[in-house]
Structures are given as structure tokens and as C-alpha cells.
Amino acid sequence: MEPVDPNREPWNHPGSQPKTACTNCYCKKCCYHCQVCFLQKGLGISYGRKKRRQRRSAPPGSKTHQDLIPKQPLSQTQRKPTGPEESKKEVESKAEPDRFD
């Protein structure tokens, strides 16, 4: 290993920058090319600005999924009003007395 020159900046030390440029390839060799390639390609971490993906618009002749649903009124669910007396009676009738006493 070469000795580090104290007069040089850290980014100019030998071995701090790879001899070849970074590529867009995602093979194993290119993923371990340098620290930046490892973070971006190997781990999938990038700190740059994210590009906004545009949604693909539907072709003009196609119908949206909302047009296919027929308009129907929502039905109200009917519930039987049960009071506390009814539920207690049902529980008492279903329960058996303890035979182990």
C-alpha cells in the first residue's frame, strides 16, 4: 500500500477514486466498483432528486372502471333491536347449572 501524502487532499489520495468511470451496468463487478456504485446499485440507496413518474393515461376509446358500475341506491341494513333483558334470558336458558358443586 502506498504511503499517504499529508499535503494532498483526502479525495486525491491514491485509491480514493477508481481508475475507470462508473457505468449504468448492474452486474456484480460493477456493483462493487466503488462506494458510490455499491450504495446506488448494490443497496439501492440514492440521495439525488427523484424523478416524478407520470401516470399512463388511458386510451381515448376506453371506458374507466367507474362507468362500468351501475348507479344503485345504497340499501339500509335492518337490525333487530335487542335489549339487555332479551340477551340475559337467552344466556340463562342456554347455560346449564354446575353439576360439580
Curated annotation (Swiss-Prot):
The record marks W11 as: Essential for Tat translocation through the endosomal membrane. GO terms for molecular function: actinin binding; cyclin binding; metal ion binding; protein domain specific binding; protein serine/threonine phosphatase inhibitor activity; RNA-binding transcription regulator activity; trans-activation response element binding. It is found in: Host nucleus, Host nucleolus; Host cytoplasm; Secreted. Pfam families: Tat. It comes from the Viruses. Asymmetrical arginine methylation by host PRMT6 seems to diminish the transactivation capacity of Tat and affects the interaction with host CCNT1. Residues 38-48 are annotated as: Core. Residues 22-37 are annotated as: Cysteine-rich. Residues 1-48 are annotated as: Transactivation. Residues 49-86 are annotated as: Interaction with the host capping enzyme RNGTT. There is a cross-link at K71 (Glycyl lysine isopeptide (Lys-Gly) (interchain with G-Cter in ubiquitin)). One of its GO terms (biological process) is symbiont-mediated suppression of host translation initiation. A motif (Nuclear localization signal, RNA-binding (TAR), and protein transduction) lies at residues 49-57. Zn(2+) 2 binds at C25, C27, C30. Residues 1-24 are annotated as: Interaction with human CREBBP. One of its GO terms (cellular component) is host cell cytoplasm. Interacts with host CCNT1. Associates with the P-TEFb complex composed at least of Tat, P-TEFb (CDK9 and CCNT1), TAR RNA, RNA Pol II. Recruits the HATs CREBBP, TAF1/TFIID, EP300, PCAF and GCN5L2. Interacts with host KAT5/Tip60; this interaction targets the latter to degradation. Interacts with the host deacetylase SIRT1. Interacts with host capping enzyme RNGTT; this interaction stimulates RNGTT. Binds to host KDR, and to the host integrins ITGAV/ITGB3 and ITGA5/ITGB1. Interacts with host KPNB1/importin beta-1 without previous binding to KPNA1/importin alpha-1. Interacts with EIF2AK2. The cell attachment site mediates the interaction with ITGAV/ITGB3 and ITGA5/ITGB1 integrins, leading to vascular cell migration and invasion. This interaction also provides endothelial cells with the adhesion signal they require to grow in response to mitogens. Belongs to the lentiviruses Tat family. HIV-1 lineages are divided in three main groups, M (for Major), O (for Outlier), and N (for New, or Non-M, Non-O). The vast majority of strains found worldwide belong to the group M. Group O seems to be endemic to and largely confined to Cameroon and neighboring countries in West Central Africa, where these viruses represent a small minority of HIV-1 strains. The group N is represented by a limited number of isolates from Cameroonian persons. The group M is further subdivided in 9 clades or subtypes (A to D, F to H, J and K). This is Protein Tat. It comes from Human immunodeficiency virus type 1 group M subtype J (isolate SE9280) (HIV-1). The gene is tat.
